[in-house]
Amino acid sequence: EDYKMSNLPEVKIGVVAVSRDCFPESLSVNRRKALMKAYTEKYGTDSVYECPVCIVESEIHMVQALEDIKKAGCNALCVYLGNFGPEISETLLAKHFDGPAMFIAAAEETQNDLLGGRGDAYCGMLNASYNLKLRNVKAYIPENPVGTAAECADMLHEFISIARAIVGLSDLKIISFGPRPLNFLACNAPIKQLYNLGVEIEENSELDLFEAFKKHDGDERIPAKVKEMEAELGAGNHKPEVLPKLAQYELTLLDWIEAHRGYRKYVAIAGKCWPAFQTQFGFVPCYVNSRLTGMGIPVSCEVDIYGW
C-alpha cells in the first residue's frame, strides 16, 4: 500500500467573510470574491472553498456558516474581515470550528471612496485578536495579516502547510519501540506535551518488536518484498544475503501499523537501532526506515519521539 496519500492530511480551507452591520455587507462579499479570484488565478481551486454565507454581526449567521463549511468537508477555516467585522460572532466561529483557523483582513483599495468603500478591517483585526484571547481560542494570525486580495491569497496559500500540520497532529499516532538508548536523554519524550498537541502515542518495548519479527519468519510475502528491494537497489545491492531479513522487518512494521493504528488516520514510527538491535535482529534497520519514509510513513531512530 502506498501511504503517501493516506498518511498525508488533505486540507480544505473554508473561507468565510464577515461584516459589521454599520458597514456595507457588499463590501465584505465583494472583497471575498476578489480574494477567491486572486487565489484561484494563482494557485487553482484545490484546497479552498468559498462559503456563501457572510456573517453580519449575527450568531445565527455564524451557525449557518459553520454548518455550511462542515457540509463542504472543510477541515480548516479562514475568517476574512472584509470590513471591521463582528468580533463576537467571528471569534465564536473559530471557537466552534473543529480545526485550525486563520484570521486575515482586507486593506483599503483606494482613497476615492471613503463612504461606501471604507472597511476599517485593520482596526477590526485588533478587536478580533483581543476577543480570541478573551475566549482562549487559538488561531493563526500572519505577521502582516492585512493585505490586498493578492497578498491575502498568498497568506491563504501559506496557511495550507500550517493547517496540514495541525490537522495531522490532531489525528496522529506515534508508535514507538524503545526504551531510548543509554545517555540519550534528548530522546526522552514528554508524553504530556504530546497529549497537549492532540497526539496519541503507543509505547512498545524492543522485545515486543522482536517477538513480532520472529512471528514473521517464513512469511510468504518475503520473496516478493526481496525482489522489490533488489530492483530498487540495483548495482548497490552489496549485501543480498541480508535482504530477506530486511523484507521480514519491513513487513513486521507495516503489519504492526495496520494492527495498532486504532482510530487514528495518520501514523509515524519512532524506532531503535542500537546497541542490541544489530546483534539480535541481525541487521541495521536504516534501509527499511528510509523505504517506509519514502512510502509516506515518517520514521525516526533512537526513539526520537518528540524531535522528529
Predicted regions and their residues:
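Metallocofactor- and cofactor-centric catalytic cores in central/energy metabolism, strongly enriched
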Residues: Y3-V167, D171-I175, R180-A270
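Glycine-rich anion/phosphate-binding loop at the beta-strand->alpha-helix junction
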Residues: R264-W308
